[in-house]
């Protein structure tokens, strides 16, 4: 259900900064229809690229509900519900379940710098409180917290924890986690540049920034890699390499929102 290219969709904002800034619902709907038409395999709402850290809890729930309602079951919706407060993560995950999200993506608690045991207890508390499929999210470059493979394997035994978005670009971790957590545990990358190799090492797909602007190419590349067509996947991967790099010339999501603005999908607000 959660394989292939899953877009880490941006959250379109009406131009403005401060209390007058609002979610641009028509632009969001237009983007979602574009992704469904282009073959995107799932939508990830309010993740890092969706500016989860700057949305209020109310805005989080509004965006998740809007996306679930617009998509209307045509492809899966994964809701970003992580927080550096366990109570807030539980609250956001509850909201996602109530509005009909198919799964949740929970980033490691940022800024707090928890121990591995602290990470285990945090995720265990969320998983045991809310009955919805949950995907761990490890992105130490953004959080100053690295969830190690042994901790991920340990968490894989808990009901409702179905996989991990492993965004370190450390391909050695794919086999470490796969060997420990088993074949059914979902392994997703968050690094567009290494997606092809991640899948060929045994991963299941990507939660992608690049898919915001090249959804069909990312979907096709993932499908080729998953089918074992190394040459076909490599050809598409080579075509996408420059785009991957350009979308990270500044902090995500600044470049990708700039491109979407230039393409006419969204207004200029970040």
Placement of each model-derived feature along the sequence:
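A general structural signal for well-ordered alpha-helical segments in protein cores
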Residues: 3, 28, 60, 64, ...
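Catalytic alpha/beta core domains of metabolic enzymes, predominantly
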Residues: 128, 142-248
């Amino acid at each position: 259900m959660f394989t292939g290219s899953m877009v880490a969709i941006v959250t379109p904002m009406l131009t403005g900064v401060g209390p007058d800034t609002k979610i641009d619902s028509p632009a969001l709907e237009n983007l979602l229809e574009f992704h469904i038409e282009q073959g995107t395999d799932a939508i990830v709402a309010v993740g890092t690229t969706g500016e989860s850290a700057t949305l209020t809890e109310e805005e989080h729930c509004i965006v998740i509900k809007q996306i679930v309602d617009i998509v209307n079951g045509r492809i899966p919706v994964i809701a970003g519900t992580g927080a550096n407060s366990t109570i807030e993560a539980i609250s956001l995950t509850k909201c996602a379940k109530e509005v009909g999200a198919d799964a949740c993506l929970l980033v490691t608690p940022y800024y707090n710098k928890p121990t591995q045991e602290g990470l285990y207890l945090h995720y265990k508390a969320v998983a045991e409180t809310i009955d919805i499929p949950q995907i761990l999210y490890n992105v130490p470059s953004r959080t100053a917290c690295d969830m190690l493979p042994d901790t991920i394997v340990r968490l894989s035994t808990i009901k409702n924890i179905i996989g991990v978005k492993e965004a370190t670009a450390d391909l050695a971790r794919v086999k470490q986690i796969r060997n420990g957590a088993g074949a059914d545990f979902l392994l997703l990358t968050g690094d567009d540049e290494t997606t092809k190799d991640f899948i060929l090492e045994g991963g299941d797909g990507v939660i992608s920034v690049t898919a915001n602007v090249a959804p069909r190419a990312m979907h096709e590349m993932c499908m080729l890699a998953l089918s074992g067509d190394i040459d076909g996947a490599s050809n598409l991967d080579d075509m996408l390499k420059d785009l991957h790099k350009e979308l990270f010339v500044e902090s995500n999501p600044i470049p990708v929102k700039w491109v979407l603005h230039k393409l006419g999908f969204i207004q200029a607000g970040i």
